[in-house]
Amino acid sequence: MSLSGFPISALGLPLPPSLIPSLSEPPVPTFSSLNPATGEPVWTGPAATPAEVAAAVARARAAFRPWSRTPHAEREKILRAFALALEIRRVALADAISREVGKPTWEALTEVTTMAGKIELSITAHARRCADFTGGPAITRFRPHGVVAVFGPFNFPGHLPNGHIVPALLAGNTVVFKPSEHAPLVAELTAAAWRDAGLPPGVLEVVQGARDTGAALVDSPDLDGLFFTGSARTGLWLAEKFARTPEKILALELGGNNPLVVWHPRDLRAAALLTIQSAYLTAGQRCTCARRLIVPAGPEGDAFVTYYITLARSLRVGAPTENPEPFMGPVISASAADQVLAAQTALLARGATPLLLSRSLRADTGLLSPGLLDVTAVTDRADEEIFGPLLQLIRVPDFDAALAEANATRYGLAAGLIADDPALYARFRDEVRAGLINWNQQLTGASGAAPFGGVGQSGNHRPAAFFAADYCSYPVASIEVPTLTLPATLPPGLNPF
């Protein structure tokens, strides 16, 4: 396994003379990940150059044939060894997630647990969805694509790329992984776990870097596919790039402007807690986070909103290392925090009513307080995903209007209803257009034993999680006759000698 961009100096060893750059050589571009709660560097190292990206793809190509011919049981064995290696590194990996991404320790530990749990789920999914099967005289088998690229996001720097990498390797592909530039240390530790699990060299290549490194990987002519989790803007750019190469598989898992409808719940406390977790987990940086809160106009809706605001004000926000532990850490960077606050300012300028303003809690960091704006009177609301702890409230006169508002988006990732009436949920489930629809459950709760993906501009109909096996291989249908014989009947005009 190769780690392009690995900082040798981080090992505390002197550089060998052959690796000391001469004064005449151009400087190697470097980048750093920063702790979003403090602004301090966590990891510093070189970004992979286009030549290094090409070399990584070439190594993955060379490793593909032997890896794809490795018995499936042996690949499963390596995957299970990887799960054990993650458990051994659980604390170190969670610490890296907290420092690079800002997740509280409880949340970072949960992510590592989810990474390890992905192994058995992927093995089960592959067995169910990619097993050879027969139908009459035909048999269908599944083959890996070849070399696939995986682009990882920052919000789940371990879990989400893992959700592509594990099923891809299990199917027999080799992978070139470009992690988020915000979480290179998490990627290094994950790659080390794969190495300790016995993954052969070249089967997983890691190329560190930001936009230029990613662009070099996208432009590689020797890729057979790319699996991406991230913003809709980047996803649309990738779709355009891949439009002229239909022979390459492209799986896009994008964001959403997700609606959560709260409709006359009897238990205001439970409804408010579910809404808080839907809107503000991971500082509002989960792609399934609620962005729009839809409630009935009138006293009952007002009562819920009042209770919700009281609860939101009590949330503990802070650095992951603080004691007692916070519910919510920072957004990924000070720049990201500025973007959330700029979006809030723009909505206020259009007529939104501030019910709970999101504020910067510490200069030059990503620490923000949760926000809630009433945008009912804003007629020109942008259909955009605000990636942070800012929720927009919309009051509607009836449930028909709630359904219409829920569908008023070009996205379609997640949607939820909090209500006691099962008949309302039956309507919601059947009429709202989204790939993930929850009832009396936080939007940020998804099952690895089910598909994960959206419609509209939230993806390209390549759901991940339990259905990731589908885009990690392709079917080959064969009609096979072991003994060559003359057909019993021949078409008219065809007479054998």
Where are these regions (language model features)?
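Short, well-ordered beta-strand elements within core beta-sheets of diverse protein domains
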Residues: 42-48, 63-69, 150, 260-263, ...
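Conserved C-terminal structural/oligomerization subdomain of aldehyde/semialdehyde dehydrogenase
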Residues: 35-44, 223, 261, 310-313, ...
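Residue-level signal for inorganic ion chemistry
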Residues: 39, 75, 97, 172, ...
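ALDH superfamily catalytic-core signature
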Residues: 234-377, 439, 488, 495-496
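Residues at or immediately preceding the N-termini of alpha-helices
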Residues: 36, 50-53, 72, 90, ...
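Structural signal for hydrophobic packing residues in well-ordered secondary-structure cores
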Residues: 64, 68, 83-90, 94, ...
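Rossmann-like NAD(P) dinucleotide-binding subdomain of oxidoreductase/dehydrogenase enzymes
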Residues: 131-270, 298, 396
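N-terminal Rossmann-like NAD(P)+-binding subdomain of aldehyde/semialdehyde dehydrogenases
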Residues: 1-137
